[in-house]
């Protein structure tokens, strides 16, 4: 009976996962395409900014050395036109990066759903083995899980989160807010997923923060790339709220004690 049921579980899962490789490949290819396009825009704005600053410097020298500014109006018009082009390119690049993050979240959720389905089938198969006396009744219902997310994974990974609030990029401190809106903490929407009945917490689920718990709710990332204090931190654990969150460089309690954080 157990052997027959094994075949059923395998066939069902293979059918369920039949479109998985193509879907994942499509998402990753799109992410790569968006990354190339956004990087091209970033390089373009970098060159435009450099040229614009050089033009402004030359205009300033001409103004200081002469009582008249020959061609100054043309240079100002050129600088203003280029400034608008730079702003437009930045907005387009930011839009592409946001789309890239959303696709990366979809890819993670896709992988996560297949892993959960596999865990569920393994649990059901283990229960069948118990009923047939193939394994002891007190054997854990979950078979040893395969590692999904390496614990050494760094904080800048993209994972699924609830839908972010609409961002007004012109009024925000991009360097700080990108950690909140575009680079949310790993797996923070898992509280919304229905867990498999009676399944214990996956021991491979990464833990963060000073509380050493899994990610959930609003979290903030430490700006120390080599953070050893938890990498991502729940607002409540570090005394933050969405209204009082820190703008600028933010370091966790552990990294604040390091010299380079000052």
Curated annotation (Swiss-Prot):
The record marks 208, 219, 223, 232 as: Histone H3K4me3 binding. Ubiquitously expressed. Gene3D superfamilies: 6.10.140.1740, Zinc/RING finger domain, C3HC4 (zinc finger). GO terms for cellular component: nucleus. Zn(2+) 2 binds at residues 222, 227, 252, 255. Zn(2+) 1 binds at residues 209, 211, 234, 237. It is found in: Nucleus. A zinc finger (PHD-type) spans 206-258. It comes from the Eukaryota. SUPFAM superfamilies: FYVE/PHD zinc finger. PANTHER family: INHIBITOR OF GROWTH PROTEIN, INHIBITOR OF GROWTH PROTEIN 5. Histone-binding component that specifically recognizes H3 tails trimethylated on 'Lys-4' (H3K4me3), which mark transcription start sites of virtually all active genes. Interacts with H3K4me3 and to a lesser extent with H3K4me2. This is PHD finger protein ING2.
């Amino acid at each position: 009976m157990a052997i027959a049921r094994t075949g059923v579980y395998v066939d069902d899962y293979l059918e369920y996962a039949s479109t998985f490789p193509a879907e994942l490949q499509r998402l990753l290819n799109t992410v790569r395409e968006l990354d190339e396009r956004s990087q091209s825009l970033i390089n373009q704005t970098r060159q435009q900014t450099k040229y614009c600053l050089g033009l402004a410097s030359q205009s300033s020298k001409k103004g200081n050395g002469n009582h008249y500014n020959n061609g100054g109006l043309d240079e100002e018009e050129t600088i203003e036109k280029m400034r608008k082009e730079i702003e437009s390119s930045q907005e387009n690049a930011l839009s592409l990066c946001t789309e890239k993050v959303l696709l990366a979240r979809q890819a993670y959720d896709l992988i996560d759903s297949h892993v959960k389905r596999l865990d569920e089938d393994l649990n059901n198969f283990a229960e069948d083995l118990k009923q047939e006396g193939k394994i002891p009744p007190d054997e854990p219902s979950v078979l040893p899980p395969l590692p999904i997310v390496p614990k050494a994974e760094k904080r800048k990974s993209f994972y699924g989160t609830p839908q972010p609030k609409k961002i007004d990029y012109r009024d925000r401190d991009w360097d700080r807010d990108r950690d909140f809106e575009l680079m949310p903490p790993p797996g923070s929407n898992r509280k919304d997923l229905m867990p498999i009945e009676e399944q214990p917490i996956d021991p491979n689920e990464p833990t963060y923060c000073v509380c050493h718990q899994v990610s959930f709710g609003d979290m903030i990332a430490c700006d120390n790339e080599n953070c050893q204090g938890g990498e991502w931190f729940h607002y409540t654990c570090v005394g933050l709220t969405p209204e009082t969150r820190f703008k600028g460089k933010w370091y966790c309690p552990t990294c604040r004690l390091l010299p380079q954080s000052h």
